[in-house]
Each structure stands twice: as C-alpha cells, then as structure tokens.
A protein has these predicted regions:
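Buried hydrophobic packing segments
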Residues: 74-82, 140-143, 166-174, 230-231, ...
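Short acidic, glycine/serine/threonine-rich loops at helix termini
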Residues: 110-113, 167-168, 193-200, 251, ...
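Conserved beta-ketoacyl condensing-enzyme motif
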Residues: 4-5, 29-142, 146-154, 188, ...
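Conserved small-residue
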Residues: 7, 25, 78, 99, ...
Length: 375
C-alpha cells in the first residue's frame, strides 16, 4: 500500500508555521537563546523558546484556555499540517482520523512545576491548572477534543527518536485499518530547567548559547516547539519506508545498531540527502561514522543548532524539514558545523533530490530512520 505525507506543520522558535520556519533555516538564521527560568540550584542553562505570540491563536480556543504551552504548540502545529493538507478549519474528521502524539518529557515538566509550587508555596498556591498537564496524553486529548475526533488517540513516550516510531505506528494503522483515512502525527516538547540539569549529569547539556555538531561533543541546548505530519493514501510526499527501530544496550553497540538500521532503510534506494539528529552529544559521532561508511557522498543537514534539541518533537521536525527539502528541491545549511563529517552541508543550496533519509539516535538508546520520496 502506498502512503503519503499529505501535509506538514510546525511551530518553532523561528516561526509560527512550517513555511516560515523553513524560510528561516534556509536563510541560515539561528533562533534566540534565553536562560531557563525557575532554576532549583545555581547552575544555569540556556534554551530556545517559542515566542508566546506564535501560539496566541491556539490559546484563544475555548477548549485550550486552561491548557499549558505544550498543548498549545501541538495544536498550532496540527492545524498548520491540516491546512497544508487542504483541510479547512471546522472540517469534520470524525472517526476517520487517528491522532498519534510523540512526546518525551513534557508531562514530567508539569509534574515538577506542580509539586514545586505545592512544597514551596503551600497547598493553596499550587495551580490546579497544572495537574491535568502532568499526564503524558493530555496534549493528545486536548487536540482530539478540539478537532472533534471520536476515533483513535494515542501517545507514544520516548526519546528524540520517538517521532519516527509514531510515524511508523501511523503507517501500520493505515495499512491494517482500511476504514481509517488519515493519521495526524504530532510531536511536541516544552523545556524545563530540571531537564537540562538531568542531562548535565550525563555530560549532555551545554552551558553556552551555542553548540557544535559533528565536532567537539560539548552537549546540547534544548529547544521548544511542535511539528506535525498528516499521513494518508492520496497524493503528497511518498513515505517509501518506515521501521520500528532498534535498541542498543551500550554506546559500544550503538555503531553496529545504527549501521543496521540505515542499511535496512536504504537498501538500493540511496537518498539524495540526509536530515540528521546530530545535537552535540555522542549521537554525532555515531551518525558521522555510519554516513561516512554507507553514504560518503550524500549531503547531510542537521537542524538542531538552529532550533535546539526538541526531544519528543525533534524527529517529527526532521521529517517536516525532509519533506520540505523534497518539495522545494533544496537542502538547508547546517549552523555551527564541525569538521568530522566532510559531507555536512554548510550552506543552503538547491539540488535535485529524489529521496530523503531521516535518522535519529536517542539518549534512551533507540535508533530509527525513515525514507521519503519525491512526489
């Protein structure tokens, strides 16, 4: 069965929609950094926030007025993807559309905030509006209600590769359930000080305002945002191949596992470009070795120096950018590019792209990828 990405959407630190975000990354712009607020110790970390004005329209929806930023960003990206797929606001999707959310730590952040208020300010000060957001599937529930969907709704929790797992799951649903017309896959993530501090204990969080990819591994900077894709059976960007991914049990195993995942995804359909998950951590070294072994001449783009590491949303962001690369026949340039990967694209340029490979290596020892074609 042929499946297609019929529409893409996003809200990012650089734009309120996918089109603006794409224009900004192609222009070589970097989103502004700010210090993370509400720190619990004297350690400081930067993050890449989404401006409040970018989710203002979503916040005006009556069903989302008490929702957190996590849910607002997811709804904004979903509406953008549906509009890109040709579905006007108010279109009744009913039970013909399934919603699948990919998330990493967003709900944990709200749990931390709720109990922090409870313990530091007393029971009367803790906001009850935070409590519903502590549940991982809160964002998916809000969106399903907003779109008046009475069908299937799922939330997948994982690391920065979870978005590709969500897309693979959506492809399985469409393949096995002929009555289902569409799957809306949304990845969303909100930053928090405790998240950066946890990653710092693993030496994976940067203390500066920028980080290098495919160079010196000095840690990453977390970014906020949401990305979405609409999967269906009609025209769009062909979804050539997806997979469940594989797990590695130590960093010594990671290279062999990543090589196997990419080999199985590519087969004989070599991509014209790769959209990488490089983020200034151990993942860069593994991807660099795999790309040099299997795809030594293929241009590689890494978006995270521009927008930050968005964890649960990141591989959906990668898929959106890969789809737009195919649509516009252009590969963006990578900011803060190191010297460990000769094929790393450092400046945006037009080029003929027939297939685009998306790869993701997550901190929770997951590796996944997908392959897109040119419509």
């Amino acid at each position: 069965m042929s499946l297609f990405i019929q529409g893409v959407g996003a809200v990012s630190p650089l734009g309120p929609n996918a089109a603006t975000t794409w224009a900004q990354v192609v222009a070589g712009n970097e989103a502004p950094r700010k210090l993370l607020p509400n720190r619990l110790a004297d350690r400081e970390y930067y993050y890449v926030p989404v401006p409040e004005k970018f989710v203002a329209d979503a916040a005006r929806q009556s069903r989302l007025r008490r929702s957190g930023t996590l849910s607002l960003m997811g709804a904004a990206a979903a509406y953008d993807a549906l509009a890109d797929a040709g579905f006007l606001p108010g279109y009744d999707l009913g039970a013909n559309c399934a919603v699948i959310y990919a998330i990493c730590s967003g709900g944990v952040n709200y749990t931390r905030r709720f109990y922090h208020e409870l313990l530091t300010q007393g029971p009367g000060a803790a906001s009850p509006m935070l409590f519903p957001e502590t549940v991982h599937n809160a964002a998916a529930s809000h969106l399903a209600a907003l779109l008046k969907l009475d069908g299937q709704s799922y939330t997948l929790v994982g690391d920065s590769s979870v978005g590709l797992s969500a897309i693979h799951f959506a492809a399985q649903l469409l393949t096995t359930q002929p009555e289902l017309e569409l799957c809306l896959v949304v990845g969303t993530e909100e930053a928090d000080w405790v998240l950066s501090d946890a990653f710092d204990t693993w030496r994976m969080a940067a203390r500066k305002t920028a980080f290098e990819v495919f160079g010196k591994s000095a840690g990453t900077i977390f970014g906020e945002g949401a990305a979405a894709v609409v999967l269906g059976r009609t025209s769009g960007v062909p979804l050539l191949r997806t997979g469940p991914g594989l797990t590695f049990f130590s960093r010594l195993d990671a290279l062999a596992v990543a090589r196997q995942v990419v080999e199985q995804m590519v087969l004989d359909e070599y991509p014209g470009c790769v959209v990488s998950s490089a983020n200034g951590t151990f993942a860069d070294r593994i991807e660099a070795q795999v790309f040099q072994e299997l795809l030594p001449e293929t241009p590689v783009y890494a978006y995270k120096p521009a927008l930050g590491e968005a964890l649960g949303a990141s591989s959906v962001f990668q898929t959106v950018l890969a789809s737009l690369s195919l649509r516009h026949q252009t590969i963006p340039g990578t900011l803060n590019a190191g010297n460990r990967l000769p094929a790393l694209c450092r400046e945006s340029r037009p080029m003929k792209i027939e297939r685009a490979l998306v790869t993701a290596i997550g901190f929770n020892q997951q590796v996944n990828s997908l392959l897109l074609g040119n419509s």
